[in-house]
């Protein structure tokens, strides 16, 4: 089925919602080529504006707007009211050309792993004189454009419903911003495209998805091939699928998660891809430092969020989190009240509240150095006394924090200060905490991507250690058992 035919079929189910009533107008619209225009000699723009005003004040809304928060729906309607309800997409050759471009972009949403059916783009016959239908079509096109822009920035999924550990700070554009943006753009399609992630990795995923859709005609492509690792460290783990060719569903899930990453990562930043068990320090687009990591176990997963390192502590104390006290310390202390003290911890009790601290030292759970990045999860980067774990292929062992294999080398690369070379930092090791503040906070992004580009330039799939691929696809209502025909 071609895209135009698919869009026309979609139009048959497009409705406006007014209270409890649904007003269908799809079967009254006559399909027409995109290039046709409305006869302005017979339809004054003022009449279309009057109809838009009636629809707006009646409380009728395009169905595509129903998932928006109330404030965003009001913002959308206020935009039209502020311009005297003049249509954005009908009325003159110039507007008609912009409408055609918008329709084409919306109908190709599948290329970005989105669903074109979510962004109806109604077509109106050049001979159409019913101003109500034209007004409805104008509002639907505007609402679809806004929904596309918001979804491109991550609005498709309420991440907190997937997991309380997924807390990206989404930058969702308001309807007024999107529509003003499009009105001022020379090329509407390009401007709408700019709301999609611009990161290189996203573009690689998109290119591969388009290739699969063009060559297979389906999103359920061939069965993946698993190449087992070999050697003394090989074992049946999530790393076993690290050479698996990604399916279209893998691509879509990962493209969606790129929408959770800030549009601008920062000229200098740290990027931690949890399934890759790897950390990269990037300065001006170049990787200047990389190191292995140990991340959270599936039942104590490392959160997905962005924050910034503001200081580094040599010889840190570990203030045991309440969850670890409750789940690990209290059961053992119930058997032996002196368990914590015998293990080298300091226990403070005020009423029914217990605080447990581990003093600095080689046995400290944080190791000899810690990177502070304030966040709601109380998660940070740190050293570890259990360095042997870095030799493993699968490195999901922590309580949620990110353990770094070469922390002093990373700290020196972060600080970029002759006073704090790797050896200089190691000279501070002792019993007393040493706090070093960064001149400028360094952004840190803890992300989750199971499809990456290998050293050979080919995409490969990593283990889905937390099962987020399936959660994302379920949230997007994508059934992997279906055969999704590519729209060509």
Residue spans of the language-model regions?
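Well-ordered beta-sheet/strand-loop patches within structured domains
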Residues: 2, 23-71, 139, 143-147, ...
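Hydrophobic alpha-helical segments and their boundary regions
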Residues: 2-4, 8, 93, 127
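Bacterial N-terminal signal peptides
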Residues: 7-19
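Prokaryotic Sec-type signal peptides and long signal-anchor helices
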Residues: 20, 80-83, 94, 183, ...
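N-terminal, post-cleavage mature segments of outer-membrane
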Residues: 25-129
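Mature extracellular/secreted ectodomains of secretory-pathway proteins
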Residues: 104-170
């Amino acid at each position: 089925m071609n895209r135009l035919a698919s869009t026309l079929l979609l139009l048959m189910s497009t409705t406006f919602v007014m209270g409890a009533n649904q007003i269908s107008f799809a079967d009254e619209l006559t399909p027409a080529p995109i290039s046709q225009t409305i006869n302005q000699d017979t339809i004054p723009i003022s009449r279309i504006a009057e109809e838009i005003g009636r629809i707006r004040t009646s409380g009728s809304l395009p169905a595509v707007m129903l998932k928006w928060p109330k404030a965003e729906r009001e913002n959308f309607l206020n935009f039209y009211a502020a311009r005297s309800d003049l249509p954005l997409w009908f009325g003159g050759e110039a507007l008609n050309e912009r409408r055609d471009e918008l329709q084409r972009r919306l109908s190709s949403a599948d290329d970005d792993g989105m669903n074109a059916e979510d962004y109806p783009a109604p077509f109106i016959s050049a001979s159409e004189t019913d101003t109500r239908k034209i007004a409805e079509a104008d509002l639907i096109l505007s609402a679809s454009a806004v929904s596309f822009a918001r979804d491109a920035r991550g609005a498709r999924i309420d991440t907190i419903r997937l997991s309380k550990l997924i807390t990206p700070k989404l930058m969702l554009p308001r309807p007024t911003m999107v529509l003003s943006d499009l009105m001022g753009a020379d090329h509407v399609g390009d401007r709408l495209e700019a709301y999609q992630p611009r990161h290189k990795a996203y573009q690689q995923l998109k290119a591969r998805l388009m290739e699969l859709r063009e060559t297979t005609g389906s999103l359920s492509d061939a069965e993946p091939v698993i190449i087992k690792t070999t050697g003394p460290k090989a074992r049946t783990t999530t790393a076993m699928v690290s050479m698996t060719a990604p399916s279209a569903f893998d691509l879509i899930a990962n493209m969606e998660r790129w929408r959770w990453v800030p549009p601008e990562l920062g000229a200098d930043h740290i990027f931690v891809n949890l399934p890759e068990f790897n950390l990269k320090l990037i300065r001006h687009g170049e990787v200047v430092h990389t190191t292995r990591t140990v991340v959270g176990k599936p039942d104590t997963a490392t959160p997905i969020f962005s924050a910034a390192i503001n200081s580094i502590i040599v010889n840190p104390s570990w203030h045991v989190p309440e969850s670890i006290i409750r789940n690990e310390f209290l059961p053992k202390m119930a058997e032996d009240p002196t368990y914590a003290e015998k293990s080298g911890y300091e226990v403070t009790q005020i009423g029914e509240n217990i605080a447990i601290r581990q003093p600095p030292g080689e046995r400290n759970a944080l190791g000899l150095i810690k990177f502070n990045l304030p966040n709601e999860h109380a998660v940070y980067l740190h050293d570890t006394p259990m360095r042997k774990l870095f030799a493993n292929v699968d490195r999901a062992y922590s309580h949620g924090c990110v353990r770094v294999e070469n922390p002093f080398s990373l700290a020196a690369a972060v600080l970029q200060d002759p006073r704090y070379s790797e050896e200089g930092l190691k000279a501070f090791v002792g019993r007393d905490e040493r706090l070093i503040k960064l001149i400028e906070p360094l952004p840190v992004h803890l992300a989750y991507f199971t499809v990456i580009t290998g050293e050979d330039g080919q995409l490969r799939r990593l283990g889905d250690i937390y099962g987020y691929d399936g959660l994302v696809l379920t949230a997007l209502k994508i059934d992997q058992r279906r055969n999704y025909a590519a729209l060509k």
